[in-house]
Amino acid sequence: MSKDFVHLHLHTQFSLLDGAIKIDELVKKAKEYGYKAVGMSDHGNLFGSYKFYKALKAEGIKPIIGMEAYFTTGSRFDRKTKTSEDNITDKYNHHLILIAKDDKGLKNLMKLSTLAYKEGFYYKPRIDYELLEKYGEGLIALTACLKGVPTYYASINEVKKAEEWVKKFKDIFGDDLYLELQANNIPEQEVANRNLIEIAKKYDVKLIATQDAHYLNPEDRYAHTVLMALQMKKTIHELSSGNFKCSNEDLHFAPPEYMWKKFEGKFEGWEKALLNTLEVMEKTADSFEIFENSTYLLPKYDVPPDKTLEEYLRELAYKGLRQRIERGQAKDTKEYWERLEYELEVINKMGFAGYFLIVQDFINWAKKNDIPVGPGRGSAGGSLVAYAIGITDVDPIKHGFLFERFLNPERVSMPDIDVDFCQDNREKVIEYVRNKYGHDNVAQIITYNVMKAKQTLRDVARAMGLPYSTADKLAKLIPQGDVQGTWLSLEEMYKTPVEELLQKYGEHRTDIEDNVKKFRQICEESPEIKQLVETALKLEGLTRHTSLHAAGVVIAPKPLSELVPLYYDKEGEVATQYDMVQLEELGLLKMDFLGLKTLTELKLMKELIKERHGVDINFLELPLDDPKVYKLLQEGKTTGVFQLESRGMKELLKKLKPDSFDDIVAVLALYRPGPLKSGLVDTYIKRKHGKEPVEYPFPELEPVLKETYGVIVYQEQVMKMSQILSGFTPGEADTLRKAIGKKKADLMAQMKDKFIQGAVERGYPEEKIRKLWEDIEKFASYSFNKSHSVAYGYISYWTAYVKAHYPAEFFAVKLTTEKNDNKFLNLIKDAKLFGFEILPPDINKSDVGFTIEGENRIRFGLARIKGVGEETAKIIVEARKKYKQFKGLADFINKTKNRKINKKVVEALVKAGAFDFTKKKRKELLAKVANSEKALMATQNSLFGAPKEEVEELDPLKLEKEVLGFYISGHPLDNYEKLLKNRYTPIEDLEEWDKESEAVLTGVITELKVKKTKNGDYMAVFNLVDKTGLIECVVFPGVYEEAKELIEEDRVVVVKGFLDEDLETENVKFVVKEVFSPEEFAKEMRNTLYIFLKREQALNGVAEKLKGIIENNRTEDGYNLVLTVDLGDYFVDLALPQDMKLKADRKVVEEIEKLGVKVII
């Protein structure tokens, strides 16, 4: 007898926080075991079905597509706690495995999964019997594990109920119903098996044996238990002591012979139960039409009756280019017309005319409806056709863009055009698309959030019951990897040879070498930590949860539910269960509709400038050589300027001193981790300013590299170099670009040979070509997409232009739209530096947003007051327009009879100073709000609730901070600045501060929360606010116990600590190690000068130079010195000899700071 077997009950990584089987690893193991077919049955979804199908087919293994559905015995519409006929809580649901036999079955499976989310979601996506009756055709059913309905009743010896459900399921599935048996050594399962065998005989239903595989190898069992602990938010110790029956099960992906041995003699008919898995395999189709689709599924675009798609695109492109030429936005030359014709031929030949027509349609609709659209994004800027028909607004020929960077004729794949829209109106464009192509044909797109290295370490440590610090120490050693800012994986940190890592990320990455060695050393020194890392390694990369893609939209030619399974989130938004990559492979049109706030701001600025100055700015026609713009950039005054506002970017601008649009483009491409760390940026700056000669590898490359002073900055430069030197076709050049960018080793090896051979054949010396290839490998991976950089460079230039020429309008709009408190505070500070006075809110003068009064005053907007909001602010402004003005508080309340104007709103307005024009103190007005019930409550019943006791003395600054988010008439730190003498770091400077490096902060405690830990200790979390920003601070129990008397709401404190990144939320927090009153701190710091050295500075000669400065400026009555050295894991304070005192005047401090050393006096 054949001892074959097929797994039909198997959970991949898409059984979220339950299945620990990665599909790629499953395929390798299935091939190793000799499986002819493998089935999948993820819980309640089909997220992984297409990926599973393609991966198995690629290795010649038959994929069997199934789903372990959540099934309710009641109605899927029921939402009560207990809705089923039995006493099983529907919160946990029943299970039923459904397998697609054929195309009809797959469509029905997708339909059931879709409806489970759309109609049946209650804790889990559920289906019911009614849906099975309607969509059961083409499906095979297995009765599942102990949570299956018949299995559950069979396990508790309620045989009649089990029989009833077997009969009901048989009515739908007939011979395609199988009663599922498992050999998992659970007593209830053994009872269920015995009863199900008898029921099978009685009703002529077949039995089937399954493994219910949840992890790949037997040794993965512990990692799976950890995964379950994460799902249930418990530790593994809590699970083992609780009612967790699965902890002793064998749930690995076993080979056939293991399954035969496992079931041998367990029950009557065990051989047939195993062989029935082969029967199911034979019943299922070898392939599915939906998954094998080789055409592009584009929605139908209506063209004039006498035109084809291709003819109509050509007509629009020629017409559009002529209009661009007439407006001076393109040249009427042979180069333009030949490029247009070439692109049209490629587009039409590849079958993408419809794609271009669809995209230009909704973009031009947006423009006609006054919805701002970005000038371009990504590689689409390389297309002249896109420019001609209005998809982009950047001339690709003028800027040297390559069409093949966007659409490679040698590699047929759907074009990818992402579009930026005004943030406030993005949804209108999507709604236009829904109305044009059908609401059922348009959906958002799911994204799978996977377990990444750092967070996985912390998760696993928590599940293992290990201290947070154990995993945190390891997580902080994981460095950033490539130019996209991703982190090294655990596989790389723990297993990959260091030489390979340096080859991949660059020989200059000594931080990677040091951190990897330290990471491995820690693992070897502790068996517990080694187990932590090896467990995390198995879970890294699993899908943790899903969310909706921020911008992705898919548009189909027919209802999407006929093509893919759909998902509905908690808000009812519909999305595909497949992500963007899978949708593209299936031939569907997916687009990124991005909302860009800056486009909204530019629109508002333009309207305000026209209103106040009568100037109608056309941003596309602005001269790109405006002196005021470049002066602003060179001085680093770019707070609020698109893409140029970070502290690091400001410093780069000051060093680079841009004086042309090309410099702005280059800055956007260069300000990324790779170029900054590799030295490319320094080389660019030195060459620009003539401090280093501009060199080209070959004279022929000067036209390509001249704009960037011989430095490879753009991907397009790499492509052009390969064409000039090696004779690459445009398509081959793009393949090279992709190989370098994606670090594809196999493809890189092929392209290297082709590059060198081609250049040598064209007469270039092999040695020099090989050296150039090494440089390309080293630096080209840092290169950036020029078309994207240029498009965003325009937006940067436009915002800088408004700031330089119309600063009042710039700040009024930016302050209105900025929701981030830190950025808002920086804008306030910047506005003051530009000479503007920020006026407090006034109920008779403030608008909804910030407004300009006179030449240099900006009035606070009502909507920015916490507790008011935009909708209420609009109601107030409308009432004021009607009544002209409000005489006072009572008059305001009488004239704004609206339920939105409640006690909370009025109190917020008073606290913000909106009634200060009455000359009455805020304390008095607040008391009136609380106590003048008779006078104030006449307008509304119970408007203000019960009267309060007399209001205590109030601090106006505290009130302002509470409702405005910052202090407007002063600052609590004003009283301490002289005392502290700037011996602390401004919070805004932390943006560029090294994580884990110690800092001293001074500020006001706000939003204080004291929490009780699991151990019964207390800790604190609060925001610390200074004049430059705010940061969340965490005070752990030990520190809190020592400093709790100082930690009070609204108190000014000095804190020492370090920055720490919360990897789950990506928020940066400040971990407090010490807390002082300003007086205590000033006393401790008196006559002391602190110098902070990094480890590399201590080693590379800076220390010697520092010593020289100290020796030259010693004095008997100077400052004591404390030298702090950052050694990476910890800091060392070196108190220098008492007689070593320093004359600490400003010149000496500046001399020390020029060494790149931080000084605190």
From Swiss-Prot:
DNA polymerase III contains a core (composed of alpha, epsilon and theta chains) that associates with a tau subunit. This core dimerizes to form the PolIII' complex. PolIII' associates with the gamma complex (composed of gamma, delta, delta', psi and chi chains) and with the beta chain to form the complete DNA polymerase III complex. Its EC number is 2.7.7.7. It comes from Aquifex aeolicus (strain VF5). Belongs to the DNA polymerase type-C family. DnaE subfamily. This is DNA polymerase III subunit alpha. It is found in: Cytoplasm. GO terms for cellular component: cytoplasm. GO terms for molecular function: 3'-5' exonuclease activity; DNA-directed DNA polymerase activity; nucleic acid binding. Coiled coil: none annotated. The gene is dnaE. GO terms for biological process: DNA replication.
